[in-house]
Amino acid sequence: MEQTLVIQKKKGFGFSQGIGITLLIAIAAKYLAELPFLNIMGQLVIAILIGMVWRAAIGVPHDAIAGTNFASKKLLRFGIILLGMRLNLVDIAKAGPKVLVIAAVVITFTIFVVYGLTKVFKVEKKLGILTACGTAICGAAAVVAIAPQVKAKDDETAVGAAIIAILGTIFTLIYTLLYPVLGLSPYGYGVFSGATLHEIAHVIAAAAPGGSTAVDIAVIVKLTRVAMLVPVAILIGLWFGKSEGSEGKRSWRELPIPWFIFGFLAMSAVHSLGIIPEVVAGYIVVLAYMLIAMAMAGLGLNVEFKTFRKLGSKAFVAGLIGSVCLSVLGYVLVYALGFM
């Protein structure tokens, strides 16, 4: 009996230790993300990288793994639900149908192109899907939301999120340098940035040279892409299940529907109705990013650098080429739809 209690206490301490490590990393990532240049990468990406460094330098106690796994799975879903508080459906509606069109076109195009490229480069199927969706929709958040749909492993999820983050940072710097020669108005440049960059942090940083006009519309266009995470996640789950040969009748609980995504949509609806004060909504978004950062830390703590090198090199090249194609398409659409 006493031995059982000792084992339970040890497991409980290990679980708490795992949660504590991810929280510590998430807090460190938040403050580091406020520094020049690192703010382009954002809290989520920095959390993954710190987690990987922590594992390589310090290691993760065996008993703490249960806590880091809890963070990377359960806390992740709760964080994504709360992240819906950032999305205002009214603002998206006011932006007009052209914004919906450009978001739908770039997402569809990018998923097919990037996934096609990953097949050409013989990237593992699940990592290819994650890379495609992360590039097309909303970076790391899309990667971790789609991961359960394709039953991706933690290392595939972490590598996919890191690849998208690095690509987004590179293209953010390129956009900032190219802004004076693109020939776009601040409004058009904002649409271009919001339609083609990977993370919200990337969009805001890249649009900054165009002023508040560019940043405001860039965020709206980007959040329109984020809103499409719900249908894309469902479609990816259905397609993946069919491609893997899933047969037979399944209960509604077994359908490839990420139910937590509907929580995300519900939070968006609540925010859109104006029920919650903006100040409170802002704090909820901060909490959402903290929880997702803890999840990212948990993923990073489960990945070794050699795994990243092994899995990530070909996927990175595919994502790089796909991102170039996305940028070209976005630029063409800005002109074609009259956003100049």
UniProtKB/Swiss-Prot annotation:
tRNA-binding listed as a keyword: no
Where would you find this protein in the cell?
Answer: Cell membrane
Q: Does the keyword Transmembrane apply?
A: yes
What protein family does this chain belong to? Belongs to the UPF0324 family.
| One GO CC term on file | plasma membrane
| Organismal lineage | Bacteria, Bacillati, Bacillota, Bacilli, Bacillales
Q: What is its main location?
A: membrane
Which Pfam families does the record match to this protein? Cons_hypoth698 (PF03601)
Q: What protein name applies here?
A: UPF0324 membrane protein BC_5174
Q: Cite the entry's keywords alphabetically.
A: Cell membrane, Membrane, Transmembrane, Transmembrane helix
Parts of the chain that traverse the membrane: 13-35, 40-59, 99-118, 128-150, 157-179, 189-211, 218-240, 255-277, 279-301, 316-338
Membrane-related topology note:
Multi-pass membrane protein
